[in-house]
Amino acid sequence: MNIEELKQKMDEAHYIYDDTLATVLFVALQLGRPLLIEGAAGVGKTEIAKVMAAALDRDLVRLQCYEGLDESKALYEWNYQKQLLSIQVNMGSRDSDELTRSLFSDEYLLERPLLKSIRSEKPVVLLIDEIDKADEEFEAFLLELLSEMQVSIPEVGTIRAKSVPFVVLTSNRARPLSEALRRRCAYLYIQYPDLEKEMAILRAKLPHVDDRLCAQVALAVQKLRSNEAILKKPSIAETLDWVAALDALGIRELTPDALRQTAGFVLKNNEDFEVLEETQNRECSCGSHCGGHHHG
């Protein structure tokens, strides 16, 4: 696959990208380098892994990170129930050393996302989502996989990748990631889309919706994101949900009433609702925009 073919595949997936993003994706893919994508929550980092899986016609294997994540959830664990059953059935009928060896064979190994991705016969896209939520010990454990494309299991030994996955790591920057991890990855920082890009996303994902309504919503979302008082900045997915909600109600214009009725699709806590209300009241009291369409 060359870079133009990759761009064509992303176009087919209705994914809006720029040349920098397409180039980084292509080169990381060609070099077999993991790709670390950072940015605020909701800018579309996870979507990139999904689009790449579709573009490459590969399965997407996802590891959702969280505090306390360890090898048994990320890499493998043993099927203890099956092992106990085997011990009960074979007790006395098999040599104890042979039985012990058999208990730690493939038959009793439960694959978790990391092991599944490197033991797959066909290459996959491995998404390690929100790596910043996992602790530093887990991050250190990942280094062997990312640099050597292999993992070590004490009872089995080293398992090398049958196929090399395209690895995408995402981070919301909740904590700093180690330099060792960063060195092993290509890097991409995703910002919230500007007005023009957000409009392009809305057109691509919701082509049946009136362009004027999309423009009004995109502008309102830009204003919400730039408002320092808003605690949870609207994500791209929430922008899409908001337009879909307005469209489902047959609303063709983002009036103050329409905004109030549907704001729950774009704002997700009471404090932000109060900020919106204060902003609208302030605009009305100073006589500007009150009958207009660009509240936010």
Question: Which residues does each PLM region occupy?
Answer:
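C-terminal regulatory/interaction module of P-loop NTP-utilizing enzymes
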Residues: 1-296
